[in-house]
Amino acid sequence: MFISVPLPMLFPDFLKIDISDLTALLGGISLGPMAGITIAFLKNLLQFITGMSTTGGVGEFANFLIGGSFVFTVSYIYSKKRNIQGVIIGLVSGIVVMTVVGCIANYFIILPFYATIGWSIDAVVSMGAAINPAIDSKMSFIIWMIAPFNILKSGLMSLLTLPMYKKTEKILK
């Protein structure tokens, strides 16, 4: 999360748009899905071991798991259909996969991990409720914070990827 942007009026501060995920995405498109996953892993590991983590490694794990699902989906589909149509189908599919994986992972894994480093789930829900009064439980936090955040993040990554792909299309083929 070397180049990350919080959106404080829309989401709690620990949910950040991490533009550096583009590196893993472009690596996956150009070198294949496993390369993309490896880049995502190394990026998050480097973030953690350099002491830049503000979440005790939980945020990096979440970024790898959820962002990695996006990178893998896009790059796998592109590896089967190496043209602009493959990129678009991959990006749209990646948005869906990242949103679903993000919701499931946060409900069962990520939010409970935050509790192990001293953040109660109730405190996390309260952070969301301060922004959106419809949030009153872990499930409503997932529905009203996690799902929209992952749609926004993966949608933004998709919008940034398309012009980069067009500029590098000949090299990638």
Residue ranges and their predicted role:
Residues 1-173:
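Loop-helix junctions at membrane interfaces
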